[in-house]
Amino acid sequence: MTWEERKDKRLKTKIAHEEVAGMLNQWYVMIKRHEVSQAVSIKCDIEHQLPNMEENQDLLLYFNLLDYRHKLLTEEFAASNKLFEDIQEQKADMQSTDDMIEYYYFFFAGMYEFHKKDYTNAINYYKLAEEKLRTI
């Protein structure tokens, strides 16, 4: 097998969504630690892997939620607001999501509302996140 054939085969091989999920978890750890340079590096790696990943809508929603949190970390506030609006639409289109994704959605929605200085809605979302956390 030539180098080009191996390269083509590697590009056509789908990456298991569990592998990308592991990378997403590493990314979130760096975000929580405020390790900006490592978070940016891992995000770049993930973005290169996503097109080759087996399709998984929950994982794509998780990626978008973490990307929103990443944008808050890197102070890309305008982009984070637009992304969160997209996430709300994406979530509305999905029939169901797992409890962990629901937790992150409510928690990050609370952060979004807090950023907008809508503290009442922020608290409501944080309470929903807390309730969801009990089921995880």
Language model features with spans:
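Structured catalytic cores of enzymes that bind and process phosphorylated ligands/cofactors
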Residues: K116-D118
